Regions:
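Acidic Gly/Asp/Thr-rich repetitive segments characteristic of extracellular carbohydrate-active
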Residues: 1-35
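Short aromatic-glycine motifs in intrinsically disordered, low-complexity regions
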Residues: 6-8, 41-46, 196
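Extracellular beta-strand-rich solenoid/capping regions of secreted or surface-exposed proteins
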Residues: 23-30, 38-55, 61-80, 84-97, ...
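Right-handed parallel beta-helix
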Residues: 51-57, 74-85, 97-111, 121-142, ...
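Structural detector of coil-to-beta-strand junctions
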Residues: 67, 90-92, 114, 137-139, ...
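Residue-level marker of regulatory loop/turn positions in helix-turn-helix DNA-binding domains and
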Residues: 70, 94, 118, 150, ...
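Extracellular beta-rich repeat passengers
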Residues: 173-177, 182-186, 190-277
Length: 277
């Protein structure tokens, strides 16, 4: 939607092995395909400009210590990277950034969000990622007072992600409608799975919840409730969840993995090293 997401497209490929090279490549004003090789140790947030594909080479490409900041830019793809030990967010999408695809990455042991999307960003897919050993996973909408920028935006799809013993925000949603959370595997989530707040509309569909006492609920902290529709979810040793209200129609066609098969499909397919890059 919104013209599709192609990243760097057919642009030439640059391989980066240092923090300086990574920062320069992702911050370029021209379209590029960037391959991250080995472990890059860095700090702070690196600005990612429009029309970039950022790919991890092999199974072990790692960005450690820093994060990627997509700030008002568009058409960015991030795939097959191990993010760890970030000191802010691993991936931050903000200021009306659009057409972003975050796919087949691992996130562990960072400070704040693994994938935080906020400030009017739109048309984003977060798919086939694994989050483990981490607290604040995926925030969608940063403030109860930001309705003016966020209402009508923050339309995000989360599918086939593996929330592996992570704590909270899978996602925590303000204002976005529809937000589509489907075919994810929640295993041993210690805080809560999905929270719909501040008049958001979230469809929680075909997910597999295991050992998760609070799979989804309305409101969170000081944030008032949103709407949440749940259908065709599969539960093993988990709570029932809280629903209410209605959600805008999903604007695209999609095929659901059979909910009882989601655990197998996602644990075999999510995270790095699964897509042959």
């Amino acid at each position: 939607h919104n013209g599709g997401t192609t990243g760097g497209g057919n642009a030439g490929t640059t391989t980066v092995t240092t923090a300086a090279a990574l920062e320069s490549a992702v911050g370029s004003s021209t379209a590029a395909v960037i391959r991250v090789s080995g472990t890059i140790n860095c700090s702070g947030m690196l600005r990612v400009r429009s029309n970039k594909t950022i790919l991890g080479a092999g199974n072990s490409a790692t960005i450690s210590g820093c994060g990627l900041n997509i700030n008002g830019d568009r058409n960015v793809i991030i795939r097959n990277i191990n993010f760890r030990n970030w000191n802010d967010d691993a991936i931050n999408v903000q200021e009306s950034a659009t057409n972003i695809w975050i796919d087949h990455n691992n996130f562990t042991n960072g400070y704040d969000g693994a994938v935080d999307i906020k400030r009017g960003s739109d048309y984003i897919t977060v798919s086939w990622n694994r989050v483990f050993g981490h607290d604040k996973s995926m925030l969608l909408g940063h403030s109860d007072s930001n309705a003016g920028q966020d209402v009508g935006h923050l339309r995000v799809t989360y599918h086939h992600n593996w929330f592996d013993g992570s704590n909270q925000r899978h996602p925590r949603v303000r204002f976005g409608n529809p937000v589509h959370v489907f075919n994810n595997y929640y295993d041993g989530v210690t805080g809560y799975g999905v929270a719909s707040t501040m008049n958001a509309g979230v469809l929680v569909e075909g997910n597999y919840f295991e050992n998760t006492d609070d799979p989804y609920h309305l409101g969170e902290g000081s944030s008032g409730p949103g709407s949440l529709v749940a259908r065709n979810n599969h539960f093993v040793n988990s709570g029932n969840g809280q629903t209410g209200g209605s959600v805008a129609a999903i604007p695209y066609g999609y095929t659901l993995t059979t909910p009882s098969q989601v655990k197998s499909v996602v644990t075999n397919g999510a995270g790095t090293g699964k897509i042959g890059l």
